[in-house]
From Swiss-Prot:
Low-affinity zinc transport protein. Active in zinc-replete cells and is time-, temperature- and concentration-dependent and prefers zinc over other metals as its substrate. GO terms for molecular function: low-affinity zinc ion transmembrane transporter activity. The keyword Transmembrane applies. The gene is ZRT2. One of its GO terms (cellular component) is endoplasmic reticulum. One of its GO terms (biological process) is zinc ion import across plasma membrane. Residues 1-27, 82-99, 284-290, 348-358, 422 are extracellular. Keywords: Ion transport, Membrane, Phosphoprotein, Transmembrane, Transmembrane helix, Transport, Zinc, Zinc transport. Belongs to the ZIP transporter (TC 2.A.5) family. The chain crosses the membrane at residues 28-48, 61-81, 100-120, 263-283, 291-311, 327-347, 359-379, 401-421. It comes from Saccharomyces cerevisiae (strain ATCC 204508 / S288c). InterPro entries: ZIP, Zn/Fe_permease_fun/pln. This is Zinc-regulated transporter 2.
Length: 422
């Protein structure tokens, strides 16, 4: 390792001082302004998704979600990978840093290591849940016996079967009712409630039915696109058919598997963003003449990053035992940059961003973070959301998808523009 970072000569030409030029009061103010902007960005989606008095229309959350996705993708390339390349490519480092583009190499290693981690995690999650892909009988009907009103799913070649539309399956030890994703399915009464029966029967209108087993989703507002039946999601084989006797168990297993994979993606996303936020704060605290411009830009930078992270945290269907996690994750992001600014002010005479150690540390961590956010952005936020999600299905699916795409482009463009100054 010493050989890797050693120079060919004994003269250190890296900076020996930082650009700190006073303005201590303004720098202290920056701690609180960055705190507010970070908190506003990350907590607004979380609060609006949980409290009705500030709950926004669905289209507002839709915009925030995909705008934030664009912000994260642009952050990976413009605010992480490029600065990492500049830091590790600085002429004062010399040695192996002058012979190989280490920023891109570390980014690539980080990306592949993250992919390997997700492969192993997904395997053990599926194994733990007893998830296999054997042959199963095709579902033609579902029968749920419950004391509330229901409707009949009628197979044209078989007798109608009663299904209770308030039957609760456990998704994460929470009782969450399931409904159909296809809003065009209409249930109409076919007969009056029979004496002694506690179920009202309904018949789905002809021409508007699909296999209900492939349409069950949780009605919780925080579980959009989280739960789906095997064969219809990003993590399971296409067109799997489930045996009726195993359907409820398989739904629970797939829900848990989807949940655990989504949780992993959210934690990875936060990890990459927090890494970056540390050096953002340190750089701001000792900036010289560019401090005022950098201060303004980083205020919006943190707000937009928080928005991207907050929407992903908010849409995760946390179990009752983990309801505090969104608040903790938001708090971690909110505090990271302000604390880094405060620490930087405290060590302003010893922290030199252009020094050899600082360049290497900053470049390595930015490279790692860029690999994390590039993988998360391209795989989870783009490919998974646009190609494998059920939210763009239906007659207006293409219109919604193109709208989401344009919104994401706007988020990426704005964040890329901020890269001109920070």
């Amino acid at each position: 390792m010493v050989d890797l970072i050693a120079r060919d000569d004994s003269v250190d030409t890296c900076q020996a001082s930082n650009g700190y030029n006073g303005h201590a009061g303004l720098r202290i103010l920056a701690v609180f302004i960055i705190l507010i902007s970070s908190g506003l960005g990350v907590y607004f989606p979380i609060l609006s998704s949980r409290y009705s008095f500030i709950r926004l229309p669905n289209w507002c959350f839709f915009i925030a979600k995909f705008f934030g996705s664009g912000v994260i993708v642009a952050t990976a390339f413009v605010h992480l990978l490029q600065p990492a390349a500049e830091a590790l490519g600085d002429e004062c480092l010399g040695g192996t840093f002058a012979e190989y583009p280490w920023a891109f190499g570390i980014c690539l290693m980080s990306l592949f290591l993250l992919f390997f981690t997700e492969i192993i995690t997904h395997y053990f999650v599926a194994k733990t849940l007893g998830h296999d892909h054997g042959d199963h009988g095709e579902v033609t009907s579902i029968d749920v016996d419950a004391p509330s009103s229901g409707f009949v799913i009628r197979n044209m070649d078989s007798d109608p079967v009663s299904f209770n539309n308030e039957a609760a399956y456990s998704i994460h030890n929470d009782k969450t009712p399931y409904t159909t994703r296809n809003e065009e399915i209409v249930a109409t009464p076919i007969k009056e409630k029979e004496p002694g029966s506690n179920v009202t029967n309904y018949d789905l209108e002809p021409g508007k039915t699909e296999s209900l087993a492939n349409e069950l989703v949780p009605t919780s507002s925080h579980a959009t696109n989280l739960a789906s039946v095997p064969g219809k999601d990003h993590y399971s084989h296409e067109n799997d058919h489930q045996d009726v006797s195993q359907l409820a168990t398989r739904i629970e297993e797939e829900d848990k598997e989807q949940y655990l994979n989504q949780i992993l993606a959210v934690f990875i996303l936060e990890f990459g963003i927090i890494f970056h936020s540390v050096f953002v704060g340190l750089s701001l605290s000792v900036a010289g003449e560019e401090f005022e411009t950098l201060f303004i830009v980083l205020t919006f930078h943190q707000m937009f990053e928080g928005l991207g992270l907050g929407t992903r945290v908010a849409e995760t269907n946390w179990p009752e035992s983990k309801k505090y996690m969104p608040w903790l994750m938001g708090l971690a992001f909110t505090l990271t940059s302000p604390i880094a600014v405060a620490v930087g002010i405290g060590v302003r005479h010893s922290w030199i961003p252009g020094s050899r150690r600082a360049l290497i540390a900053n470049g390595v961590f930015d490279s790692i973070s860029s690999g994390i956010l590039i993988y998360t952005g391209l795989v989870e936020l783009m490919a998974h959301e646009f190609l494998y999600s059920n939210q763009f299905k239906g007659p207006d699916g293409l219109k919604k998808m193109l709208s989401a795409y344009l919104i994401m482009c706007c988020g990426a463009a704005l964040m890329a523009l901020l890269g001109k100054w920070a």
